Amino acid sequence: PAIRNGWYVVCDPDADLVPNEFVQVCLKDGRCTIKEFVGINGGVLSLLSVNGGERFFFEMDEVESITAITDIVPPSQHRQEHPYSH
């Protein structure tokens, strides 16, 4: 899988959503998931499973937020402090 247990996912709410890249989607019912962004067409959000294959569709009125994932970091590369915080 692209994202393994214990790895860190970095989300950027200001980044553009790019087709074929990963996003975090939170629904108004409280569920959140990470999927591959396909696009939004006719008020319907299209996503693919991270593992590929299965396709998901959500009406945009069900969606609370869509956030671009800008990095996936293995535990060995994780830094507790932000590198630009000093």
Spans of model-derived segments:
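Acidic/glycine-rich C-terminal interaction modules and beta/coil loop segments
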Residues: 1-86
